[in-house]
Each structure stands twice: as C-alpha cells, then as structure tokens.
C-alpha cells in the first residue's frame, strides 16, 4: 500500500466552455465538413467527446440553461441503453429502484448537514405565494444528491433485520451550482443524472457489501473494455460532520474491505465526503487517460442524524420489548454522473459504439429509387427493426427493437457509404436488383472500429446476428 498526500483532479478539457457549447449547439458541422476539418485538427481535438458528439448529433446545449444538456434522439438512445443495462444488473445485485422528489425544504438539508457544508452548490428555490400557512415563504433547495431522500424512504416504515441489507437505486436528476468557468461538455454540468444507490445494512455486513460492490464495478468496466482500475481510500476532510470515533470506525471498515479485496489501493488523505470516507475508482480509457468514475462511501452519520433503526433478532422475539440498532449506510455509484460517463465512453470508443449500445444499428442503401427496390428496402427495414405489428396493435414490452434507417437520397452509393461510416452505423446494407431477385442482403459490418467485411445474408440470418450481438454485449 502506498500513501499519498491529498491531490486534486483537473478536467482534461481546457477549451473555453461557453464558446465550445455554443458552437456545438448552433453551428455544429455537418458530417462532411467535419471530415474536411479532420485533416487539419490534432488527434486530441478529433477524439474530444464534444467533436464526436456534434458529428453524431448526440446532444445540444443552450446559453439559456448553461450546464444542462439536451439529449437529441440518438444521444437519448445511448443514455437509455446505459440505464437499461444497469437496471438489468440491479436484478442480480438485489437493488430496488425508487423515484424521489426533486425539491426539498431547507429543513432537510440542515438535518443532513448539506446546508452547512454544501450550501454554495445548492440551488435555492424561494416560496412566495400569499398563503398564510406553515409552508408559506419557505426556502427550498433542488437536490444535489439523493441520500437524504433515501433516508426518508427508509424511515417511512418500521424496519426489521430480516429486510437488511436494503438496497435502493435512483436515477432522478440532480442539480449542483457549479461555477460557470468549470462547465465543460458532458463532463461538468449543473444538471445531471447519477446511477445513485444506497445500501442500508448491519455493521456485520459492511465488508461483504463493499466487496460485492467492488466486484460489480470491475465486472461492468471489464465489459466496456476498461480493465485498468486504481482504487483510492479518501479519508476525513477538514470540514466534516460526526465524531472522530465514528470516522475512525468508518475508515477502518473501508480499509479492511480493501485489504481483503486483494486489489492495490492508495490512501488519499483528507478527500472524503463531509459525512464519511469513500473509495474512489479511477479507470483508464483506450488512450491511457485516467478518469474518476465509480465511488463507494461508508456513512455512519446520516443514519444517526435521521434516527434510522431496525429491529434486531432479539427485538423480534422479545414480545413487547423492541431492541433496535442503527444501520450503516453505503453510498455507491457505478458510472457516477451518466452524462459524464457518456463523455468518457465516447472518447474511449472514439464514437465506435458496440452494437448493444449503438444508436444506429444499420442503414439500408438502395442502389436506385425504383419502386421495386424501395419496396424491398422498406420490407427489410420493418423486419430487421423488429417492429412487425400493425398500427392498431401494441408492441410487446419485452420485444427488442433495432434502429434501422433507409438512406435513399439521390447520391451515389459511395457518397452514402462514406456518410454512414462517419455516423458509425454498425451495419450497411446495400440493396440492388440482384438482392431483390434472390431475397438476400449485401451486408457490410463493422468490427474492431473501422475494419469491415461484406457478406451475402438473408433477412433472418442478419436478424439472428442482431439478437446474438445484444445477448453477448457485442
């Protein structure tokens, strides 16, 4: 184990944030002008997630809401896929998803300690209605994190040791009043979503829950091709809540879990959250750049402040006497900010999305605009997209659909192929007279970034390949 003094992470993007965002939102280049400009731009600029996102039309921004993202249809597809992926894994790891309010009274933030320690980052909302009741003229705050709300959910009913560990997940939007000069693309925002999770468990379960969470993190990042991880134990900061004994207990709990995990880890003195120590996970992307993403925080303070408890085994069996204990709270996020993680992933993949995560699965390119070829192209699109239902019917909830477009513009096949490759479609399907006659497809598929192969396939063969790609996370 190595020991380092407190350090600070800096954003890798040094461009003027406002200028870049207005450029992306209002003057974003077309795919072809991007290609021309690429000849003059350094690789670092070409790989910047903002450049790739503009080319692929993933999101836009507005000076009317700085630090917020408008996900366009293709960016929304990626975002939703990441959320769906996590939701599927939550079933394995025992998390129950909940939805919590966006706005809370100042009283809540004072109770949790956020108002005293995080006030500058909380957006205030003033109540000014002329109604004389206990709610009039109250000060509210947009939530910067979900933990106090999850404490309210935990406390909403009496809990027993039989329910523990209790694991909540939440994708609600969060707001933090970041300085305007710090805002940058997807990586630093004022409004964002986090794959937030909180585990309420007994003290005896701490090590197992943390080890299981570390395993979860490693599995997810391995799937995404990010196998290089660094773990940091961030300890008590100068500004904190709770007693020294409570902090020592929490830090020792994380330290023991890290030691038993077998992973290499480093102490990061004084960089914990104000309510508890944490494990920060750093991952390396394809270019060797390190990013802080996942986090695991151990918290004895919020359960104490919210007076959370559970009945023990003795309490359940003691008749009228109820013996109670305070649970431990573990904060955890696998991706962290989903928007920020998307920015990291865009650069890691250089915009070459794997099929299961792709916003553009296939494009059909008719060689001409004759009725015969266009009719077959539309039939192929309907079958491959897996939307073979009448307009009066409903698509089953559990049916996978695929994003298949037709580009029948009056341009040469070569030009349309170049455009589809700039947009990074996974499959290009050329349809001519021969394909219509034989009821086949001429398919070019992308493998290992830009390498491609071309095959003759039936619609059903290609559809089967789509299904296998998603099932295997390819």
From Swiss-Prot:
<keyword id="KW-0436">Ligase</keyword>
<dbReference type="Pfam" id="PF00587">
    <property type="entry name" value="tRNA-synt_2b"/>
</dbReference>
<keyword id="KW-0067">ATP-binding</keyword>
<keyword id="KW-0648">Protein biosynthesis</keyword>
<feature type="transit peptide" description="Mitochondrion">
    <location>
        <begin position="1"/>
        <end position="27"/>
    </location>
</feature>
<protein>
    <recommendedName>
        <fullName>Probable threonine--tRNA ligase, mitochondrial</fullName>
        <ecNumber>6.1.1.3</ecNumber>
    </recommendedName>
</protein>
<dbReference type="InterPro" id="IPR004154">
    <property type="entry name" value="Anticodon-bd"/>
</dbReference>
<dbReference type="GO" id="GO:0006435">
    <property type="term" value="P:threonyl-tRNA aminoacylation"/>
</dbReference>
<dbReference type="Pfam" id="PF03129">
    <property type="entry name" value="HGTP_anticodon"/>
</dbReference>
<comment type="similarity">
    <text>Belongs to the class-II aminoacyl-tRNA synthetase family.</text>
</comment>
<keyword id="KW-0809">Transit peptide</keyword>
<dbReference type="GO" id="GO:0032543">
    <property type="term" value="P:mitochondrial translation"/>
</dbReference>
<dbReference type="InterPro" id="IPR036621">
    <property type="entry name" value="Anticodon-bd_dom_sf"/>
</dbReference>
<dbReference type="GO" id="GO:0005739">
    <property type="term" value="C:mitochondrion"/>
</dbReference>
<dbReference type="InterPro" id="IPR006195">
    <property type="entry name" value="aa-tRNA-synth_II"/>
</dbReference>
<keyword id="KW-0547">Nucleotide-binding</keyword>
<keyword id="KW-0496">Mitochondrion</keyword>
<dbReference type="InterPro" id="IPR002320">
    <property type="entry name" value="Thr-tRNA-ligase_IIa"/>
</dbReference>
<dbReference type="InterPro" id="IPR033728">
    <property type="entry name" value="ThrRS_core"/>
</dbReference>
<keyword id="KW-0030">Aminoacyl-tRNA synthetase</keyword>
<dbReference type="GO" id="GO:0005524">
    <property type="term" value="F:ATP binding"/>
</dbReference>
<dbReference type="GO" id="GO:0005759">
    <property type="term" value="C:mitochondrial matrix"/>
</dbReference>
<dbReference type="GO" id="GO:0004829">
    <property type="term" value="F:threonine-tRNA ligase activity"/>
</dbReference>
<dbReference type="InterPro" id="IPR002314">
    <property type="entry name" value="aa-tRNA-synt_IIb"/>
</dbReference>
<dbReference type="InterPro" id="IPR045864">
    <property type="entry name" value="aa-tRNA-synth_II/BPL/LPL"/>
</dbReference>
């Amino acid at each position: 184990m190595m020991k380092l003094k407190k350090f600070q992470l800096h954003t890798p993007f040094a461009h003027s944030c406002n200028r870049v965002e207005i450029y992306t939102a209002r003057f974003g280049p077309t795919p072809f002008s991007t290609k021309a400009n690429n000849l003059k731009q350094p690789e670092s600029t070409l790989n910047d997630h903002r450049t790739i996102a503009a080319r692929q039309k993933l999101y836009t921004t507005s000076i009317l809401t700085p630090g917020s993202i408008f996900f366009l249809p293709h960016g929304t597809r990626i975002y939703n896929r990441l959320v769906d992926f996590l939701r599927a894994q939550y079933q394995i790891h025992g998390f129950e998803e909940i939805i919590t309010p966006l706005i809370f009274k100042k009283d809540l933030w004072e109770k949790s300690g956020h108002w005293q320690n995080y006030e500058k980052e909380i957006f205030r909302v003033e109540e000014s209605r002329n109604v004389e009741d206990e709610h009039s003229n109250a000060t509210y705050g947009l939530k910067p994190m979900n933990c106090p709300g999850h404490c309210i959910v935990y406390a909403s009913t009496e809990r027993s040791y039989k329910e523990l560990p209790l694991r909540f997940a939440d994708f609600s939007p969060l707001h933090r009043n970041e300085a305007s000069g710090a805002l940058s693309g997807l990586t630093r925002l004022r409004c964002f979503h986090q794959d937030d999770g909180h585990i309420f468990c007994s003290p005896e379960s701490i090590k197992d829950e943390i080890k299981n969470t570390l395993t979860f993190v490693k599995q997810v990042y391995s799937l995404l091709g990010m196998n290089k991880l660094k773990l940091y134990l961030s300890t008590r900061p100068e500004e904190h809540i709770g007693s020294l004994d409570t902090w020592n207990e929490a830090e020792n709990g994380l330290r023991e879990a890290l030691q038993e995990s077998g992973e290499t880890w480093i102490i990061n003195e004084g960089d914990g959250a104000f309510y508890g120590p944490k494990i920060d996970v750093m991952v390396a992307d394809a270019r060797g750049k390190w990013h802080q993403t996942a986090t695991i925080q151990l918290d004895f303070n919020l359960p104490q402040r919210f007076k959370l408890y559970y009945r023990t085994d003795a309490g359940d069996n003691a008749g009228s006497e109820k013996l109670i204990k305070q649970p431990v709270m573990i904060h955890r996020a696998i991706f962290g900010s989903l928007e920020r993680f998307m920015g990291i992933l865009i650069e890691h993949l250089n915009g070459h999305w794997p099929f299961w995560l792709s916003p553009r699965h296939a494009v059909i390119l008719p060689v001409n605009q004759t009725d015969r070829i266009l009719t077959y192209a539309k039939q192929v699109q309907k079958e491959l997209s897996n939307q073979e239902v009448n307009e009066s019917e409903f698509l089953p909830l559990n049916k996978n659909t695929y994003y298949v477009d037709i580009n029948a513009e009056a341009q040469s096949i070569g030009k349309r192929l170049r455009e589809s490759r700039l947009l990074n479609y996974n499959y290009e399907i050329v349809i001519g007279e021969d394909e219509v006659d034989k009821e086949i497809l001429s398919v070019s598929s992308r493998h290992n970034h830009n390498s491609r192969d071309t095959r003759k396939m039936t619609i059903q063969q290609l559809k089967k390949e789509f299904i296998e790609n998603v099932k295997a996370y390819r």
